[in-house]
UniProtKB/Swiss-Prot annotation:
<dbReference type="GO" id="GO:0022625">
    <property type="term" value="C:cytosolic large ribosomal subunit"/>
</dbReference>
<keyword id="KW-0694">RNA-binding</keyword>
<comment type="function">
    <text>This is one of the proteins that bind and probably mediate the attachment of the 5S RNA into the large ribosomal subunit, where it forms part of the central protuberance.</text>
</comment>
<keyword id="KW-0687">Ribonucleoprotein</keyword>
<dbReference type="GO" id="GO:0008097">
    <property type="term" value="F:5S rRNA binding"/>
</dbReference>
<comment type="similarity">
    <text>Belongs to the universal ribosomal protein uL18 family.</text>
</comment>
<keyword id="KW-0699">rRNA-binding</keyword>
<comment type="subunit">
    <text>Part of the 50S ribosomal subunit. Contacts the 5S and 23S rRNAs.</text>
</comment>
<dbReference type="Pfam" id="PF17144">
    <property type="entry name" value="Ribosomal_L5e"/>
</dbReference>
<dbReference type="GO" id="GO:0000027">
    <property type="term" value="P:ribosomal large subunit assembly"/>
</dbReference>
<protein>
    <recommendedName>
        <fullName>Large ribosomal subunit protein uL18</fullName>
    </recommendedName>
</protein>
<dbReference type="GO" id="GO:0003735">
    <property type="term" value="F:structural constituent of ribosome"/>
</dbReference>
<dbReference type="InterPro" id="IPR005485">
    <property type="entry name" value="Rbsml_uL18_euk"/>
</dbReference>
<keyword id="KW-0689">Ribosomal protein</keyword>
<dbReference type="GO" id="GO:0006412">
    <property type="term" value="P:translation"/>
</dbReference>
Length: 205
């Protein structure tokens, strides 16, 4: 461990690789709600969060785990599910009167076209104003899962262990997106979090 008069012990959550406090401060200075996008290999989560005197407050949330409520049958950790999760969170944000936000990617790497930016694109398309650079957004064909379907067609064996046919993913995406657009959206704040647990979901997984 480093020592010396100039050495500063990092804050606990930074040592645990969970929170980038410099980034958090920049986001808070914007004065806008944070669109907290967190991804793993299996799931995608999105929340609209504002700071408060007693901790962060989660106003709306969406999780790819709940896309099945709208007919989603494909895996929940890919780009299409990330877009749908962001779109669902965006619709709930508009319903809650939140029409602008800033993207909080936590400690995820800011790689153009990755899942956190696809979540952002979904929220933007739902009507939430989020400052962004167009160069980080994925092609629409990738949002629909056309690259996954093309790969599945080249395989002799099914791509997924489930009964879902990956070659139909783009059409399935279109159907579920239309279902979400036509749905009576509720302001769900339950994405495996409570009022002060946005730090755990709102930081790196």
């Amino acid at each position: 461990m480093a020592t010396g008069p100039r050495y500063k012990v990092p804050m606990r959550r930074r040592r645990e690789v969970r929170t980038d406090y410099h980034q958090r401060l920049r986001l808070l200075k914007s004065g806008k709600p944070r669109l907290v996008a967190r991804v793993s290999n299996r799931h995608v989560r999105a929340q609209l969060i504002t700071p408060g005197p007693d901790g962060d407050e989660t106003h709306v949330a969406a999780s790819s785990e709940h896309l099945s409520e709208y007919g989603w049958e494909a895996p929940t950790g890919n780009l299409p599910s990330a877009y749908l999760t962001g779109y669902l969170a965006g619709m709930r944000a508009i319903e809650a009167g939140l029409d602008e936000a800033v993207l909080d990617i936590g400690l995820n790497t800011a790689t153009p076209g990755n899942k956190v930016f696809v979540v952002q694109e979904g929220a933007i398309d739902a009507g939430v104003s989020i400052p962004h650079n167009e160069s980080v957004l994925a092609d629409w064909s990738r949002n629909r899962g056309e690259h996954i379907a093309a790969y599945a067609e080249q395989r002799d064996e099914p791509l997924y262990n489930s009964d879902f046919d990956a070659t139909t993913l783009p059409e399935h995406f279109d159907t579920v997106l239309e279902t979400i657009q036509d749905a009576d959206i509720t302001m769900n704040t339950d994405a495996d979090t409570d009022n002060n647990n946005s730090q755990s979901v709102g930081d790196n997984e």
